[in-house]
Amino acid sequence: MYSGPMETTKTKKRGLAAIFALCPARHVLLLCAAGVIALHLLARADHALMRRLSEGAVRPIHRALGQLNAHVPFSVAEALIALAVLGLLGFLGVQAVRLVTRPERGRRLYRLLVTLAAAVLTVYALFCLLWGVFYYGDDFMARSGLKNDPISTEQLTAVTRYFADLANTYAHRVARDDSGLCCSDRAEILRKSPEVFAATEEEFPCLAGPPLAAKGIFFSRVMSYVDFTGFFFPFTAEANVNMDSPACDLAATVAHELSHQRGVAKEQEANFTAVLASLRYGDSDYVYSASLMAYTHLGNALYRADHEAWEEIFAGLDEAVVADLRASARYWARFDTPVRTASNTVYEGFLQSYDQTLGLKSYGACVDLLVNYYYGQALASAND
């Protein structure tokens, strides 16, 4: 006997209710997290709303979290990640045993999948709120008022030479080991990090923030395997850095992660503000490291634009600078593995999900900003 569409609808509702009753709290959490993510995807087209959220709500939260966690002598972010990994492994182990040894495997498997989905979506929803909004509000160029005009090869060459000369000047103002490589005191670099942005804040109030120190990661070698020199953790508002990477790179990495801590989300802009703050700070370790970072970005662009000009500038590099650049390249070549490739693929996918590319205009945002900002200084230096 045909029950009719109304009876079929009632049956479906009872079925859905029965499924929901298997783990109601987890279903609610899953739906709430999915709702937050959906709202974020819809709202991110509203630039004004994203600006108000990022500047008026999230940055104050970051300041409070950063100041709170500054009292902890280790990376709270690393501790949370380690606990999460251990907790996940333990949870999966227990659930695997229960699936094998206890009845109602189908229901248990369903609850497990809902639990994992709810956990993943909740973390991602919080990430959208605590960091994703920065990608759709005002970027550093908009907040600072800096121009990012198209640049010529002549300008690129001049600024590349300027930073090469700066690296040459500071190469012998940093500590070096018996083999001639930079061996700056890593702990001292971290100790000085709260003051790195002090001078830059005066010119760019949009970068103002509490003077917080970057934190070294205990499992830094793991970061090297996944090609990370540092990361900003929005859940604790900490700037975390890889302490195993070459000493010549550390100070610039610290400044880069501190840029994220001060609301600069885009990677290319964070590279620029890292160089800017380090040079304004004036400390030899920071100036040298930032000069290497700037030269690397500019040199890569110049290599493609005018190879002869690049060769001329490279030939003028101090032996100590060349040694540090080559040592850094050798270090990272050791980690050229499928794990690193997979990590880079995931990270590139993450950037693309937030409509971010590695560059703007012809050479990339970092290069364009460096050339536009430092071209006048480069000309003045060349005429001295």
Describe the predicted segments one by one.
Residues 17-29:
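N-terminal membrane topogenic signal
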Residues 34-98:
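Membrane-embedded alpha-helical segments of integral membrane proteins
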Residues 73, 250-271, 275-276:
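Active-site recognition of the HExxH zinc-binding catalytic motif
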Residues 88-94, 107-141:
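Transmembrane alpha-helices and immediately adjacent membrane-cytoplasm interface residues
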Residues 132-202:
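Membrane-interface segments at or immediately adjacent to transmembrane helices
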Residues 154-156, 265-310:
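Post-HExxH zinc-binding segment in Zn-dependent metallohydrolases
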Residues 175-243, 247:
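Auxiliary, metal-adjacent structural segments of Zn-dependent hydrolase domains
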Residues 319-384:
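Pan-zinc metallopeptidase signature
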